[in-house]
Amino acid sequence: MALWGGRFSQKADQRFKQFNDSLRFDYRLAEQDITGSVAWSKALITVGVLTVEEQQRLELALNELLNEVQANPQAILQSDAEDIHSWVEGQLISKVGGLGKKLHTGRSRNDQVATDLKLWCKEYISHLHQAIVELQQVLVITAEKNQDTVMPGYTHLQRAQPITFAHWCLAYVEMLVRDENRLQDTLKRLNTSPLGCGALAGTAYDIDREQLASWLGFASATRNSLDSVSDRDHVLELLSNASISMIHLSRFAEDLIFFNSGEAGFIELSDRVTSGSSLMPQKKNPDALELIRGKCGRVQGALTGMMMTLKGLPLAYNKDMQEDKEGLFDALDIWLDCLHMAALVLDGIQVRRSRCAEAAKQGYANATELADYLVAKGVPFREAHHIVGEIVMMALTQGKALEALPLTELQKFSSAIIEDVYDILSLQSCLDKRLAKGGVSPKQVMKAIVEAKQRLKLS
């Protein structure tokens, strides 16, 4: 039965009903709707709408319904109820009779759904937090195993300077730290309860909304009823958090796709996260990573769509806001799945250390070291930069590495170059010199690993 209808003389067209109904997706708010209803029933005692005995009967029935929902949430979809609020009320009435009709006193679906969604977001954030932590842990463990794995670092997808695979892993740890911080910031802002704001002007019953907020686990009650029922900032923030983090995961996936390619050959992915070709028997495709990369656009589309939905809405509630849930549910599900999949991919990775080292020696990745060497000898950096560029050109012509050039050849470009130049051209020297905080030196990488392990509670 609909929660409205007395004012209407005609039955809703079935096509409109299907268009209007939201149970097919907002059924995911069932537990939160029941939780909010229990708290609301307690508040109704304080204003004399319910007796203690009546409230206890309602709470008992609601808890029974909660157990049924937790056992089989999909069963809700067998109903033709308009939305989750209608379904919960209908189920409650079937359990306690007319008493169930008193529960909605002083409450609107507007403040009800706003509360439900915030409760759902709070719970889902805990799942996202755990997944972000677990991916960081796998990255740190992988970094610790590969501190000595030298590989080329890239700019413009060209070999630039030598780094380690550990340093690469730790770069993504930093991105995930920011993702987690944004998520916690969002949680702080959404942790206010709209329940008791009614349709838009507040409830006519003198309910202690701060007490109500406390019962539901919120930090406080919202301050303005008009804003409270129409606020979807937390939806936008979570979609923004998801979009930014998915960009990080997409870049992670792209890096590994390249590292796994025949052209790079730095890693091999586990059979558990790859697939084959229906035509080419030799293929081993990085499907898990490609799907992470592909799903990034879907999440960002949800953010853009929600922004466009909200941008022109007058205060307060409008049915447009029903569109907040499908995109949010889908985007956060994708984000969570991709966090789990990224950890699974990394957990089974095989790093080809010799191939990484071989690639690091190519592409004149030690050219910057030669420029710094000249600076240390008193040559201005801009002049040193030009000199080394000329040396690289000669080395390219001869098909030699910088460290393979005879000293006499190097001295043609600068008399500042002497025998000790070869000490600084080794890959290890390139790494060791990056001693400043955040650099790729083994000491700094080890320090970063130790700090990350402490923060993530890794033994």
Swiss-Prot record:
Keywords of the record: Amino-acid biosynthesis, Arginine biosynthesis, Cytoplasm, Lyase
InterPro entries to which the protein is assigned, alphabetical: Arg_succ_lyase_C (IPR029419), Argininosuccinate_lyase (IPR009049), Fumarase/histidase_N (IPR024083), Fumarate_lyase_CS (IPR020557), Fumarate_lyase_fam (IPR000362), Fumarate_lyase_N (IPR022761), L-Aspartase-like (IPR008948)
PROSITE patterns per the UniProt record, alphabetical: FUMARATE_LYASES
Swiss-Prot/TrEMBL catalytic activity: 2-(N(omega)-L-arginino)succinate = fumarate + L-arginine
UniProt pathway annotation: Amino-acid biosynthesis; L-arginine biosynthesis; L-arginine from L-ornithine and carbamoyl phosphate: step 3/3
EC annotation from Swiss-Prot or TrEMBL: 4.3.2.1
GO cellular component: cytosol
Highest taxon of source: Bacteria
One GO molecular-function entry: argininosuccinate lyase activity
Name of one Pfam family that matches: Lyase_1
One Gene Ontology term from the biological process aspect of the record: L-arginine biosynthetic process
Compartment(s) of residence: Cytoplasm
Enzyme class: lyase
Family that this chain belongs to: Belongs to the lyase 1 family. Argininosuccinate lyase subfamily.
Name of the molecule in the record: Argininosuccinate lyase
Organism from which the protein derives: Photorhabdus laumondii subsp. laumondii (strain DSM 15139 / CIP 105565 / TT01)
Gene, per the UniProt record: argH
